[in-house]
Amino acid sequence: MSVLFTILLMAVIGGFIGAMTNYIAIRMLFRPYKALYLFNKRVPFTPGLIPKRRDELAEHIGKVVVSHLLTEDAIRARLLEENLQKEITETVAKMFHEKMQLETTPNELLHQLGYENAEGRSISWLETVLEKEINHFLTIKKTSQMNELIPVMLEKELETKLPHVTERITSKLTLFIASEEGKLQIKMMLQKFFEEHGKMGSMARMFINVESFSEKIQQEGAKLINQEDTKNLINQLLTTEWKNFEAKELQELIPTEKQAHLAEQLTSEIIQAFPHDKIFNQPVQVILRDYEVMIKSKIIPFAVERMLDFVATHSADIVERMDLAKLVETQIATFSLQEIEKLVVEISGRELKMITYLGGILGGFIGVIQGILAIWI
């Protein structure tokens, strides 16, 4: 009986020592958090292994993460996965659909982004820029001829329109002369002519019936205007005037002292014509409503695909600039030792307990052997 008791006692003692040894060894990975001193000498094994090597551990984990986990190839492969593209597209489309149910004006949107009085500031900025650019244009182009400033396409278009202008002029003149107003105007001109020529005019008036003579002039005037020679003459005059206009320098038409006033006036006209109230106070959703289906089905998938492709193509530069190793190291360094211990225990708690139990089993086995050896030796 004493033999069995001795063996069991040795097994219990060995198991207890083995379990406690492993338990203490595990605890010494984290504890104590700080170095302990006795008689101004640091106590051995303090602080614990992880607190002592914390900085090195953080640095090596960062390097391992970048070298073996978040590699450029791994990131690129993940970004180019169809499932990821599909998930992001669905998420963006869902967010867009939710926003389309609201009514948000550009003014409100810019206000949310911290841009106060967006409409007023934008109009003020546009006004300043326009006036500055117009003044600049008038200054640097003042010695340029008009044919240099007018676009070639517009110049050709205007030249082709000159015959039409001639036709319109002759048509309007014919209608005017044939009208009662035209007849009255001719009659008044004849009467004025006679009055201005004194006795000769009075004598001529005795032999000429102003009414019938006015009608005759009216008829002949209409015929004269519609003759090809007259039309050619008018067209030639218009062409000559147009060429003279093109040959003039800008400063001849707009003197330097009037440039500022003209720039201000043009700017004012442009600002008044600019539909800023509609642009800034109409809900964005109203503007996009007609394009909602196209945005969801085409623009969002295309934008997501291009974005992921761009990030994947430049993943090496992005990873390098982000310095992921340093980022991981910094994040680990911000963890308190208590948090690190808790994290490790939560992840490996069961395995750590098994190590403790294994120490107890091995210790018990060694105790049995020691008990047997103690009895027989």
From Swiss-Prot:
The keyword Transmembrane applies. Its main location: membrane. It is a multi-pass membrane protein. The keyword Transmembrane applies. It is found in: Cell membrane. InterPro entries: DUF445, UCP032178. Pfam families: DUF445. The chain crosses the membrane at residues 1-21, 357-377. GO terms for cellular component: plasma membrane. Keywords: Cell membrane, Membrane, Transmembrane, Transmembrane helix. Belongs to the UPF0754 family. This is UPF0754 membrane protein lwe2241. It comes from Listeria welshimeri serovar 6b (strain ATCC 35897 / DSM 20650 / CCUG 15529 / CIP 8149 / NCTC 11857 / SLCC 5334 / V8).
